[in-house]
């Protein structure tokens, strides 16, 4: 199997971490997002969405992190995507929630406009309004994650690690670029620490820290 990805991207890191944890052998093909390779015709022919990751398994091609995680979990027979209907539905629910609620506000509304020039709004007023709106909503979703999804649980679906944790942890740790303080949400900080304690975390996320986190150390960002 081949994975088109970028090792620092929020969407690629969940797949790479899951594959590393499960010993899944992938041929990694880096798409240079910083150079705009995803917008070139050659990659557009692979994924018309012009986004990573993309998984190729023989003649089968699959896009979207959540879909790829489910596919790999099925192939590996991983308990991280349980077969029992209600447990699996809960994992699907949490993954949809991360993608449609938390990521929309925390990543696309609050962080990306501050981190990525291509996401910055056209003028300062619109930029400030966008960040302020997203900040209000992101804090709400962080409280839902802290109080309802996590609570006293070890992971977002209960006591067992699932692919929903792999998806969500990449979104939350994007906040490290802007040095976000999650201490108001102690269950979230506990869960982040647990996920980062995985033996594969450092090697999989090395490029993320070198390319995004470390270069932003002196940049000023809006706080939550």
Describe the predicted segments one by one.
Residues 1-129, 222-223:
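GST-like domain detector, emphasizing the conserved glutathione-binding G-site
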Residues 13, 36, 192, 212-213:
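Generic structural signal for helix capping and beta-alpha/helix-loop junctions
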Residues 33-34, 189, 209:
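Conserved beta-strand edge residues that scaffold enzyme active sites
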Residues 45, 197, 206:
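Phosphate-coordinating loops and pocket residues in cytosolic domains that bind phosphorylated ligands
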Residues 73, 171-172, 205:
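Active-site-flanking alpha-helical
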Residues 94, 99-197:
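GST-like fold's C-terminal all-alpha helical module
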Residues 200-201:
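Juxtamembrane membrane-interface segments at transmembrane alpha-helix termini
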Residues 208-224:
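Acidic/histidine-enriched, glycine/proline-rich intrinsically disordered or flexible terminal extensions
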């Amino acid at each position: 199997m081949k994975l088109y990805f970028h090792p620092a991207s929020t969407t690629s890191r969940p797949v790479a971490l899951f594959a590393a944890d499960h010993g899944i052998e992938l041929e990694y093909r880096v798409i240079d997002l910083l150079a705009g390779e995803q917008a070139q015709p050659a990659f557009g022919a692979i994924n018309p969405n012009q986004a990573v990751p993309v998984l190729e398994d023989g003649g089968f091609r699959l896009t979207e992190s959540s879909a790829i995680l489910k596919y790999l979990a099925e192939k590996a027979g991983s308990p991280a995507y349980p077969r029992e209907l209600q447990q699996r539905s809960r994992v699907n629910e949490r993954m949809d929630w991360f993608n449609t609620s938390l990521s929309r506000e925390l990543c696309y509304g609050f962080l990306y406009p501050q981190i990525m020039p291509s996401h910055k709004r056209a003028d300062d007023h619109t930029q400030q309004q966008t960040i302020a709106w997203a900040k209000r909503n992101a804090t709400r979703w962080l409280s839902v994650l802290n109080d309802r999804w996590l609570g006293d649980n070890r992971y977002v679906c209960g006591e067992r690690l699932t692919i929903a944790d792999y998806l969500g942890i990449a979104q939350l740790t994007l906040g490290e670029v802007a040095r976000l303080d999650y201490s108001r949400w102690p269950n979230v900080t506990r869960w982040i620490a647990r996920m980062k304690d995985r033996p594969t975390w450092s090697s999989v996320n090395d490029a993320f820290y070198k390319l995004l986190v470390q270069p932003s150390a002196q940049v000023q960002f809006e706080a939550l």
